[in-house]
UniProtKB/Swiss-Prot annotation:
Keyword vocabulary terms for this entry: Acetylation, Cytoplasm, Hydrolase, Nucleotide-binding, Nucleus
Protein name as catalogued: Adenosine 5'-monophosphoramidase HINT3
Gene: Hint3
Subunit structure: Forms dimers to octamers and even larger oligomer. Interacts with CALM1.
Subcellular compartments: Cytoplasm; Nucleus
């Protein structure tokens, strides 16, 4: 079910911005990932990201042993809303995902899937990078849901290639 996008977009972080974050990042009170990024979902453990404009947390329905979501604090609907100006942000999201795997001593990056679901196949309408490893552990459904460069899921490499054109 898609997350409702109505609500207060552009509202400042109700808890106040953390040091180094954009003072006016878009906030949608109806978006669960905006609330997670603002620290308003206490059951969601946030992991440190070097880039203060991002948050990282575990997926609630992991497809493999390691399944993290890297999310910009700024509300961006999906990968369809990105352009060349977002390349650096996407690259930072990838770096944050790799760091999470390395912290867990996972370094076989040939067995990692990183990518985004494409609307209307997004369960939450807030941009989020899936960082999943090891891919060899995927069951039948995960192989389908996270199928590389399908109509519903695109890899980071595919997205960056499109953004650079």
């Amino acid at each position: 079910m898609a997350e409702k996008q109505a609500g207060l977009v552009g509202e400042p972080d109700p808890e106040g911005s953390s040091p180094g974050t954009s003072e006016s990042w878009n906030y949608d009170s109806n978006c669960v990932f905006c609330r997670v990024a603002a620290g308003q979902e206490p059951k969601t453990e946030l992991f440190h990201c070097e880039n203060e404009d991002l948050v990282c947390f575990k997926d609630i329905k992991p497809a493999a042993l390691y399944h993290y979501l890297v999310v910009p604090k700024k509300h961006i609907g999906s990968c369809k809303d990105l352009n060349k100006d977002h390349i650096e942000m996407v690259e930072s999201m990838v770096a944050a995902g790799k760091t999470m795997l390395e912290r867990n001593n996972f370094t076989d990056f040939t067995d990692v899937r990183m990518g985004f679901h494409v609307p209307p196949f997004c369960s939450i309408s807030h941009l989020h990078l899936h960082v999943i490893a090891p891919v060899k552990e995927f069951g039948f459904l995960s192989k389908l849901v996270y199928r590389q460069d399908s109509y519903w899921f695109v890899t980071v490499d595919y997205l960056l290639e499109k953004l650079r054109k």
